[in-house]
Design a protein with these regions (language model features):
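Generic structural signal for small/hydrophobic residues in well-ordered secondary structure
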Residues: 24-25, 134, 191, 233
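Anion-recognition interface
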Residues: 60, 71-78, 100-123, 151-152, ...
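Short linear functional motifs in flexible/disordered or boundary regions
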Residues: 40, 44, 50, 108, ...
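PAPS-dependent sulfotransferase catalytic core
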Residues: 1-89, 206-221
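PAPS-dependent sulfotransferase catalytic domain
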Residues: 89-202, 224
Length: 248
């Protein structure tokens, strides 16, 4: 039986990511997608599609995963992971999509979609995962993809307002990319607890094996971080509790 034809009556939660592009969402989603009961569509947010019912949405995701990946093979963040032998193909308990920056942008530009999709279409509880990376690194990475420094700073904190709204009103957890890389077993277990799925030692070991050794500190790779820009970002960071403690 293919993924797309699996029963969806056991699905407990819909999973959505919130945050920014190039913040570690792809790595985080890939680790969860290793789990046999979690099915995540890469580069997808329900806010950018039009679905009339929950069943239509869930079946669409499962069918696209099967069609594009021939099972559970998916390309995440520049690497393709093997469908972990013995750990894939389980009953779907959590289904969702990963496009953290796209979700933040959609909520920023069209906030009424939030209620329309997450309250009116999706009837099962929605679980949110917010992936937080050092803002200086995340902003720097923006500038490597056609953003000017000041524009990158501006859009980053505009999206942060969308993140703040979700975290203050929805069933969510924050995962810091730096902590995930340092202690992948601990952070993956915490996310799975949030999603109500059991984990095994083999699954956690497999997750640990695909995580790189240290976060990329891209802020040191450019020369445009003036004192004024550093101070501006420092001031902005203080406005968001979930960014507390980050420094240049």
């Amino acid at each position: 039986m293919g993924v797309g034809s699996k029963r969806i009556d056991k699905v407990k939660y819909y999973l959505s990511f919130i945050g920014w592009g190039r913040s570690g969402n792809s790595l985080t989603a890939a680790l969860l997608d290793f789990h046999p009961n979690i099915y995540i569509k890469n580069e997808f947010t329900a806010l950018q599609e039009r679905f009339k019912s929950q069943d239509q949405l869930l079946r669409w995701i499962l069918q696209r995963i099967e069609k594009k990946t021939q099972g559970r093979w998916q390309a995440w963040g520049g690497f393709t992971h093997d469908p972990f032998k013995g750990m894939t193909g389980g009953v779907p308990l959590v289904i969702g999509g990963k496009k953290g920056g796209g979700t933040s942008n959609s909520l920023m530009n069209n906030p009424e979609l939030f209620t329309k999709i997450y309250d009116d279409v999706i009837k099962i509880p929605v679980k949110w995962i917010h992936v937080q990376r050092n803002p200086y690194d995340n902003i720097t990475t923006f500038t490597k993809h056609n953003w000017k420094p000041d524009g990158a700073i501006d859009i980053y904190f505009k999206q942060a307002e969308s993140v703040k709204k979700v975290l203050s009103s929805r069933d969510s957890i924050t995962v810091r990319l730096e902590n995930l890389i340092k202690n992948p077993k601990v952070e993956v277990k915490r996310m799975c607890d949030h999603l109500g799925v059991d984990v095994t030692g083999n699954y956690l070991k497999h997750c640990k094996n695909v995580v790189w050794n240290k976060p990329r500190k891209t802020r040191f790779s450019v020369n445009w971080w003036t004192k004024e820009r550093k101070d501006l970002v420092k001031q902005k960071i203080e406005e968001f509790d979930f960014m507390g403690g980050y420094k240049f």
